[in-house]
């Protein structure tokens, strides 16, 4: 069992294992080097690194297009931006709360989850999170492939028909571009986390500068910002607005609900709690709102510049840039999109599921193998279908999974901050018979709390599919993230108080 004598407690609160304890747990079936606690000497991410991480992740095409779904639902431009800002400010709270154990103990998300769910039960939240990340990986890979396809079409004569006609609704060269971009992601995964940090550091300012230049060009070309900024909201009453605002806010929270769980995958490399927290607070809500605002302004100007284009095409930067006549402009723009999409895809959608799959089979699956599995599942989830319907993307995909991930976040935050008061036995997180074994490696309290949270958050649409309409449950689905988080947190805390785990005693139970 883990003891205080096997750890080194640093003055800034960070904890690491003594060399002999590290050597001992390295023989455990729950250990591999990708899941190992990071030594304090190797925790070197600064405020800039965390800010750059969020800036590069926020500068992606889905962020650029976020406002489009909200405006098409009836909001005006400032209502859409306030919704985005508020959603990202709210999700910052669970992100910071779950970031703390990463920096304090140097552990990734799947290992952190062992404290609440058990050494084997942690696979439940890890794999739930991984499947969502695989879907996001596929979406970003498809977007990156579209950017490459636009780039190739501009510089290679006859590119669009190079492989013949449409296959499965898309040209053969579209599929080829998708696979090339997919391969670029896998290449960076195999080069490791240090290359990722370098990519994030220079991708963040590069993408922001290029988008600002595109905005300046659009304003100059259109002699202003166009009509979108004077367009009125379609809602006549507060009640009408509220019906759209709540599910929209839930969707905005859901946009980064994945990272609200797995930020320990990054904060484990943090130089201090202050540096990781400041970097995230400064970068996340501001960057998301500013980049979405840029999308609104560029699209508004584009309405004037390209009046022949359909409304949905104007919100797609790939189709918009495809209208340019200058090859060099298209090349620079699409290179920017490729860099931005690579940065966000690997950081947001590969690091966590790769660790999650490694956690399920530590001795069989490495981080690299987990990344490859993520890429394959991302293709199988058919991202081109998820992106085909903008309203479905926001109100089904984002809202839907937010309830499930919030149910996990509620358990993790309650366990770490309320039940354990941030005190974890680091060595036991890697031991099959340590404190977190519970019953056969599963903490049934955490599992029940998660399932109850998911059930209440998802009950409305699930019952509606079989013809049972319960108005209250339909309303609760609009609040899916809040419902999942609140119900799971309350249920878990209640169960831990009424039937507390016996820790060491339960570990040795027969």
Where are these regions (language model features)?
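Hydrophobic alpha-helical segments and their helix-loop junctions in multi-pass secondary transporters
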Residues: 141, 145-154, 206-234, 255, ...
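Selective recognition of specific alpha-helical transmembrane segments in multi-pass small-molecule
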Residues: 59-63, 86-94, 128-140, 205-221, ...
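Juxtamembrane transmembrane-helix boundary signature
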Residues: 84-117, 129-132, 136-142, 301-302, ...
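Hydrophobic, membrane-embedded alpha-helices of multi-pass small-molecule transporters
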Residues: 47-64, 177-184, 190, 216-222, ...
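C-terminal membrane-solvent junction of multi-pass transporters and transport-like membrane proteins
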Residues: 37, 408-494, 505-506
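Membrane-interface "cap" regions at the ends of multi-pass membrane proteins
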Residues: 2-77, 92, 221-225, 235-247, ...
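Membrane-interface loop-to-helix entry segments
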Residues: 128, 139, 145, 176-220, ...
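Transmembrane alpha-helical segments of multi-pass small-molecule transport proteins
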Residues: 126, 153-190, 205-214, 248-263, ...
């Amino acid at each position: 069992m883990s003891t205080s004598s096997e750890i080194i407690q640093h003055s800034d609160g960070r904890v690491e294992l003594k060399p002999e304890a590290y050597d001992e747990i390295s023989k455990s079936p729950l250990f591999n080097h990708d899941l190992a606690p990071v030594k304090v000497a190797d925790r070197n991410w600064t405020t800039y690194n965390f800010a750059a991480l969020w800036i590069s992740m926020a500068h992606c095409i889905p962020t650029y297009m976020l406002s489009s779904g909200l405006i098409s639902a009836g909001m005006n431009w400032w209502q859409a931006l306030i919704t985005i800002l508020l959603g990202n400010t709210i999700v910052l709270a669970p992100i910071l709360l779950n970031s703390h154990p990463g920096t304090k103990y140097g552990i990734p998300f799947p290992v952190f989850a062992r404290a609440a769910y058990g050494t084997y039960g942690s696979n439940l939240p890890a794999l739930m999170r991984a499947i969502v990340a695989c879907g996001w990986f596929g979406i970003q890979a498809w977007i990156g492939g579209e950017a490459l396809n636009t780039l190739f079409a501009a510089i290679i004569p006859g590119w669009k028909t190079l492989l013949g006609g449409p296959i499965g609704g898309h040209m053969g060269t579209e599929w080829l571009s998708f696979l090339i971009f997919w391969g670029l992601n896998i290449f960076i995964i195999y080069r490791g986390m240090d290359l990722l940090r370098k990519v994030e550091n220079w991708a963040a300012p590069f993408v922001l500068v290029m988008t600002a230049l595109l905005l300046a060009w659009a304003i100059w070309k259109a002699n202003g910002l166009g009509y979108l900024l004077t367009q009125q909201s379609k809602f006549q009453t507060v009640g009408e607005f509220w019906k759209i605002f709540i599910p929209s806010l839930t969707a905005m929270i859901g946009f980064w609900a994945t990272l609200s769980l797995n930020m320990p995958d990054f904060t484990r490399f943090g130089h201090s709690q202050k540096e990781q927290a400041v970097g995230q607070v400064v970068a996340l809500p501001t960057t998301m709102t500013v980049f979405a605002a840029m999308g609104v302004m560029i699209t508004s100007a584009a309405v004037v510049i390209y009046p022949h284009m359909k409304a949905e095409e104007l919100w797609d930067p790939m189709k918009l840039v495809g209208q340019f006549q200058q090859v060099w402009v298209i090349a620079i723009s699409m290179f920017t999109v490729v860099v931005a999409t690579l940065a966000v895809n690997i950081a947001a959608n590969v690091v966590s599921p790769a660790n999650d799959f490694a956690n399920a089979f530590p001795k069989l699956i490495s981080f690299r193998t987990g990344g490859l599995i993520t890429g394959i599942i991302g293709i199988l989830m058919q991202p081109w279908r998820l992106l085909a319907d903008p309203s479905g993307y926001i109100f089904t995909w984002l809202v839907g999974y937010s309830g499930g991930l919030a149910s996990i976040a509620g358990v993790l935050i309650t366990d770490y901050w309320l039940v354990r008061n941030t005190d974890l036995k680091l060595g036991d997180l890697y031991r099959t018979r340590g404190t977190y074994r519970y019953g056969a490696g599963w903490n049934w309290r955490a599992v029940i709390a998660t399932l109850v949270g998911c059930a209440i958050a998802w009950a409305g649409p699930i019952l509606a599919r079989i013809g049972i309409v319960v108005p209250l449950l339909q309303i609760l689905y609009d609040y899916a993230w809040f419902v999942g988080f609140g119900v799971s947190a309350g249920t878990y805390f209640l169960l831990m108080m009424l039937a507390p785990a016996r820790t060491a005693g339960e570990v040795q139970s027969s």
